[in-house]
From Swiss-Prot:
It comes from Mesorhizobium japonicum (strain LMG 29417 / CECT 9101 / MAFF 303099). InterPro entries: AlgH-like. HAMAP family: UPF0301. This is UPF0301 protein mlr7511. The lineage of its organism: Bacteria, Pseudomonadati, Pseudomonadota, Alphaproteobacteria, Hyphomicrobiales. It comes from the Bacteria. Pfam families: DUF179 (PF02622).
């Protein structure tokens, strides 16, 4: 993706990099209802992020078989941690492509540093590492991503489509996917019951 390639070569960060994007009540696009998106790259050319609280039906072992990383017999023998690794729905764009957000203890040449603590890798090498227990300490994987053109996300935020707040590794990698939306709102002092459509930035 051009935006990620640009981020690897450009100095500095966009002001929405390493932020949570939280869908406001009344989100008009059903694909993003109650969604939390982690922004991986942002610049004047656009933005790219991954929904972190929607899951796919596909299981991680099945994905490894589909990608030719291992056969079905090898997939059956995966350690429990790899078998239970949740595949998430990262967004409506390029849904056949996989992305792994992970802690900075694992880096390869293709890894994109989003923040001091968080990297993004989109190659099969990290899937092999995770399946063999040699992967990062914390990771989440998603198929597809969420993307915006130049100025599009800024407009949606200004029109109160989204709240933004700084991301934290603890909430990003927290395994409680169902409660992630409410927990992130609570972390910035917002009760969903009192959140109005006119709310601004957190």
């Amino acid at each position: 993706m051009d935006l990620l390639r640009h981020k690897k070569t450009a100095a500095g960060r966009g002001f929405l990099d390493d932020q949570f994007l939280i869908a406001m009540p009344g989100m008009k696009d059903d694909r993003f209802t109650r969604s939390v998106i982690y922004i991986c790259a942002h610049s004047d050319e656009g933005a790219m992020g991954l929904i972190i609280n929607q899951t796919q039906q596909m299981l991680f072992p099945d994905l490894l078989v589909q990608l030719g990383i291992m056969n079905e017999q090898e997939a059956i023998r995966l350690p429990a941690q790899a078998r239970d690794f949740v595949v998430r729905n990262g967004g409506p764009v390029d849904r056949s492509r996989g992305f792994v957000l992970h802690s900075g203890d694992y880096r390869v040449e293709s890894s994109l540093t989003v923040s001091d603590d968080i990297c993004l890798t989109a190659t099969v090498d990290i899937l092999r590492a995770i399946s063999s227990g040699r992967g990062p300490r914390h990771a989440l994987m998603a198929l597809g991503y969420s993307g915006w053109g130049a100025g599009q996300l800024e407009t949606e935020i200004a029109e109160n489509g989204w709240l933004t707040c700084p991301a934290s590794p603890e909430l990003l990698f927290d395994a409680d996917i169902e409660r992630k939306y409410d927990r992130i709102l609570a972390s910035i002092g917002i009760d969903l019951a009192h959140l109005s459509l006119a709310a601004g930035h957190a």
